[in-house]
Amino acid sequence: MAKIIGIDLGTTNSCVAVMEGGEPVVIANAEGNRTTPSVVAFKNGERQVGEVAKRQAITNPNTIMSIKRHMGTDYKVEVEGKDYTPQEVSAIILQKLKAQAEDYLGEKVTEAVITVPAYFNDAERQATKDAGTIAGLDVKRIINEPTAAALAYGLEKGEDHTILIYDLGGGTFDVSILELGDGVFEVVSTAGDSRLGGDDFDQKIIDHLVAEFKKDNGIDLAQDKMALQRLKDAAEKAKKDLSGVSSTQISLPFITAGAAGPLHLEMTLSRAKFDDLTADLVERTMAPTRRALSDAGMTPDKIDKIILVGGSTRIPAVQKAVQDFTGKESFKGVNPDEVVALGAAVQGGVLTGDVKDVVLLDVTPLSLGIETMGSVMTKLIDRNTTIPTSKSQVFSTAADNQPAVDIHVLQGERPMASDNKTLGRFQLTDIPPAQRGVPQIEVKFDIDANGIVNVSAKDLGTNKEQSITIQSSSGLTEADIDQMVKDAEANADADNKRKEEVELRNEADQLVFATDKAVKDLGEQIDAADKEKAEAAKEKVTTALAGTDVEAIRSAKDELSTVVQELTQKVYENMAQQQAGAEGAQAGGQDDNVMDAEFEEVDDKDNK
């Protein structure tokens, strides 16, 4: 059976893994790194992904970072005259990870398990699934990142215990409490903030640097795009440095220019100052942590293990806050950057049957309901309900002879409908005339194992039914997704063709150089006609290289290659003939100089 790969599609970095010999294994990228920056850049029609895209972000304004923060919204980014949705940009990253896995496995990969933050709403989950489809992947399961981390951690653990997963990534924060035992991974509660992550810690440093520089030089670096990108890179590096040292030097020469000439940014940032700048962010993570414990009906002493996930959990202040709250040190036996992808690979193994005796019971992170009279949200499914699940409730009309009801589907925890997230709307029509309160309208919610919602409404009097599968709020239809799949495939083909063209041009250019060298080295050994023929073929290649016709380059290169081969063959033949002639002459000369000599046999006996 074909492998199902596990993908951690992160805000800052992404990672791909697969089950090999009963163990999840991270697949390194072409650069040899185990994680790939979630960065996409466009340059003259060419797409760059990962490390190469991140490296040129300072000079290329068409660089897209942290697109995950916009999943499930109608946000679009315009690049080189084309609008890209977050799904399309994410699909480009997924395509790279897919190709990475195919290179490693030596076979085509078509199926994947993709992780999302536990606190992602339905629209964000659907958008992630769409991104996978656009990338040419059949997304077999969407699972929550903390749950994936628990799968990777608990695969070989036999004993029953309760774990708290604290997941602070580049752009999102989740905390989940799970009970593990006998191969059952049961999520008891989950909470989080899908707008909080390492990017926000970077931004605090950037704001500090901008403010200090403005105070010293009167120039606002926030208005300079190139300076801002340099500041972002420096802030990210400083944050990482401060996880291991107590202070770090930030040095950005020629950051901008003033009236007197170039200006440089030189600043020392201490860990104490960094902790002060980011104290509010660390505290923001503690509110969901407290809520998750409360929802689980637990106190910190009931937690057996704390597992930290996500690169931002390397920040000492974050580790201290978690330890102070729980009274326990975090478990150090997992790599926070890789554990989620490893868990996704385990889930892939569960689906293919490679991993046995593992049952995953996840929960819905937010309550689901509909708007009822008075703009109130009436909940049908409470948060932290184990999924998949189904729940129905009977409602009625609010007015006499009401011919239709609007079903406004909501997700959230607030009592008023307007304060919650709208997942979708649909209408049940042709309700027979009746006094208000008489018609019986059954509303049913279904949540599948991916956490994606289906809602139906049925008039119990007429059995007329209307249903809706909640689409991402970006409004992508099946036709939109199909078109994006075709575009992605076409772009992949175009990328391959562009690579082939570059290789062909390099080969042709190298052949021109080799021809020049051969003609020069052989000199008088080539007759004028052959030299002229080689020059003409070489000129044809040079002309083709100046144009855009790939076939013309290939044809001219092949022609020059043939001419050069014939030329060198003729030279070798001439050299062979000359050598043979020289050897013959030498042999003849030796015969002429032979002298006849008389000899007399001497008997040794006579000399004794």
Swiss-Prot record:
Biased composition (Low complexity): 576-590
Record keyword tRNA processing present: no
GO molecular function ontology, one term from the record: unfolded protein binding
Residue ranges, compositional bias (Acidic residues): 593-608
Alphabetized Pfam families for the sequence: HSP70
Chain positions covered by the region annotation Disordered: 575-608
InterPro entries the record matches: ATPase_NBD (IPR043129), Chaperone_DnaK (IPR012725), Heat_shock_70_CS (IPR018181), HSP70_C_sf (IPR029048), HSP70_peptide-bd_sf (IPR029047), Hsp_70_fam (IPR013126)
Induction info: By stress conditions e.g. heat shock.
Modified-residue entries (Phosphothreonine), positions: T172
CDD domains: ASKHA_NBD_HSP70_DnaK-like (cd10234)
Membrane-spanning intervals of the chain: none
The entry's keywords: ATP-binding, Chaperone, Nucleotide-binding, Phosphoprotein, Stress response
Domain of life: Bacteria
PANTHER family according to UniProt: HEAT SHOCK PROTEIN 70KDA
Assigned protein family: Belongs to the heat shock protein 70 family.
Biological role stated in the UniProt entry: Acts as a chaperone.
Identification of the protein by name: Chaperone protein DnaK
Organism listed in the record: Exiguobacterium sibiricum (strain DSM 17290 / CCUG 55495 / CIP 109462 / JCM 13490 / 255-15)
Name of encoding gene: dnaK
